[in-house]
């Protein structure tokens, strides 16, 4: 009898302990970012932001009383490493969802793994092929390049400019932009008169620009990330190129204005709204999220929050919403993610559906112009 | 007419880029001429020149001239330390081993600069404004004139030094025959050290004057170094003027290739011509073939 009582007591105690442990068990989320390597300008702010947001969610009591645990690995922008680390997250760490990777290459490489393991992935990379065609378990937060192209073409059409020259960088980003520029041109009644490229490390583009100056083009669209576009802006000023110059969202940061100096004046580009959050009209849906993110990032890292951090902010917040609505199982999270509608984030207002795992429209971009070393909205 | 205008612009742009290659090529040739080593860390000296100037300007708040002097001086010291620590201690090393060491050093320098100053590209303000100057229907920037000017000065300086000073002659003697130079009482070790010091200084100077045009970051040295190396090869790794012409030809070909044929194949065109030269005239474009005496 005495033995029975003690066993009952012991098992009761154990039961209590285990439920207590269960309640305290955090929800594990995996994160893969290219914190080092050539894409570190993406990965570093993304990691910072993801950790910042998770810490804050936990400080405010977690999701439905449970803390989030963010397990972050650095892919170094290397697809092979990304695959190994994704396997590690799925098999060893047993995460319920993964955010990142930072680059399109890394994301494409790990898609087969998450599809097989049936773990939802929210990629922070921009390539449209990540979610086209739609994969059951893959979502993304970064705006598609195609949306930026559409934003530029829309403006050109409004100004009745139909002949353009394009100058794109010969890397993945430029190739994707070039593809989109060519694919969408006909739809907006635009004719591409000259199609040139430059190398990512080139230091002089006057040859290409002299050729464009001699053509009938009414606008130049240049697709690249720093420092190439800054060189192009300076060369264009040197040559006295008189047609309007449009850049891509790849240079939508103050760094571009700093590098191009006076030559940046008058250049237009499609940008996510982070850049011009304080200029947005009061009724903009994203305004509250944007201002909160910028203030938060400023407090934590003494630097201006950018789009890249924004992609991670969106990924964590979308995940938080999905866990609240769909529970902590991978399948539940996936279904809740797909059902997300009108979520005002940093990159845009997200509405996922069974047919659209990118979730944004071209209104995610706003067209800005450089004036007096600062951005103004193009009306 | 339009085409003529364009071609003028291509040539002027090409010459401007080419003189950058020429200057970097020269600093390759200086070390090669006295040691027989191809210093693949040369591009890193160029990068250090630019990065250190920007650092002295923005963080130490020095005036431009002082910042440039500091940058060149510090890079020169780095060149000296590099020779002392990595080249000197290896007795009887083959040139191939030394070349591999310079590659290692270049990776090390690049990594350290990345850790110390970050990965961002930075721009140096132009020395005398950015108002374009018009020449025969084409335009160039005041900074291009600085580059032309400094290149000419460096060539003249090298000429005078190597042909008319005792140290310069001694350095040339080392490149012809180390052993004989040693026998006549030239301290070969000191001459090698000298060559690293001079070439680090020239490299840094090149880095400083091109930084306002090309901007600078921890990794600009790789491509610039490669192009400078091409210029030096075209010039036969020797005679000052040959390397300069090599650089100018390379720059002009790139620019004409990009403008007239296809910008996508710009580098391919330049490197194809480099290969042709290596096949047809391995001794360089402007050098007479050397005959080995037996």
Residue ranges: model-predicted function:
Chain A
Residues 2-9, 23-379:
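Extracytosolic ligand-binding ectodomains
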Residues 11-17:
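Sec-dependent N-terminal signal peptides of Gram-positive bacterial secreted proteins and lipoproteins
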Residues 17-23:
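Sec/Tat signal peptide C-region and signal peptidase I cleavage site
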